[in-house]
């Protein structure tokens, strides 16, 4: 089972939007050196929506090669087309990804039965790939209910779910209903500590991009049930957990990494660089959390 701090890695870019492969290598090494437990490649934070299929697969492969087995790599291979998701998942499996992250289909708003059949079809098409589901209704306009997740838990290679609802009572109910059949991961930095203390096995984190060591330590403490240490670290990171979402993710976190000297300012349209009026707030959060 993959556990701990799973960074939702940004995809660094040049000002013209081309991928900056050298900066990507630097980020991978930065995370391994600072204790990150796993990397999520080409998810929402990695700008999956604006990478073409060839770039998508190339980026996953590049990260897997750079990691070289040191920590798990989870490949973002979801989509709102089941056929496309199967194709991406198949390619990620060939490249050696340890698992894939499959977002609930967005925009076309399937029913709960449609969601079940979508994830079932991917699992059956790529039976050797461990699959982590991803429910983020704030982005997809489609909410996968706990009952559907419990039903999907019967499929052998579906091994987890990233819960980005931010609803702790609901997440705790899901953990109880699954009874260990799937690992539940937080997908919301601001509430991750509480969900892990309730039994979640890790956090797919935006904040970990800029504070990998502290986030890894928080996840370790929370999973171990050390509430005092979890609360201390959560308080330290809370300014980042809040300010990295002043504009749509990954806009603020890419600017934060730029401010840290880790990457350039490149981001792809329709996303634009962080509004200047928010620069001070993000910089203050970096300082408050001990990053700068």
UniProtKB/Swiss-Prot annotation:
Provide GO CC annotations from the record. Answer: cytosol
Record-given protein name: 4-hydroxy-tetrahydrodipicolinate synthase
Q: According to its UniProt record, which reaction does this protein catalyse?
A: L-aspartate 4-semialdehyde + pyruvate = (2S,4S)-4-hydroxy-2,3,4,5-tetrahydrodipicolinate + H2O + H(+)
The residues listed in the UniProt record as binding pyruvate, with positions renumbered to this chain, are 45, 204
GO MF annotations for this entry?
4-hydroxy-tetrahydrodipicolinate synthase activity
* HAMAP family from the UniProt entry: DapA
Function of the molecule: Catalyzes the condensation of (S)-aspartate-beta-semialdehyde [(S)-ASA] and pyruvate to 4-hydroxy-tetrahydrodipicolinate (HTPA).
Its EC number is 4.3.3.7
* Record pathway: Amino-acid biosynthesis; L-lysine biosynthesis via DAP pathway; (S)-tetrahydrodipicolinate from L-aspartate: step 3/4
Family according to the record: Belongs to the DapA family.
Q: Does the keyword Lyase apply?
A: yes
Site note Part of a proton relay during catalysis applies to: 44, 107
Q: Which organism is it from?
A: Marinobacter nauticus (strain ATCC 700491 / DSM 11845 / VT8)
Q: Which domain of life is it from?
A: Bacteria
The UniProt entry, under PANTHER family, shows: 4-HYDROXY-2-OXOGLUTARATE ALDOLASE, MITOCHONDRIAL, DIHYDRODIPICOLINATE SYNTHASE
Q: Which SMART domains match?
A: DHDPS
What does the UniProt keyword field contain?
Amino-acid biosynthesis, Cytoplasm, Diaminopimelate biosynthesis, Lyase, Lysine biosynthesis, Schiff base
* A Pfam family it matches: DHDPS
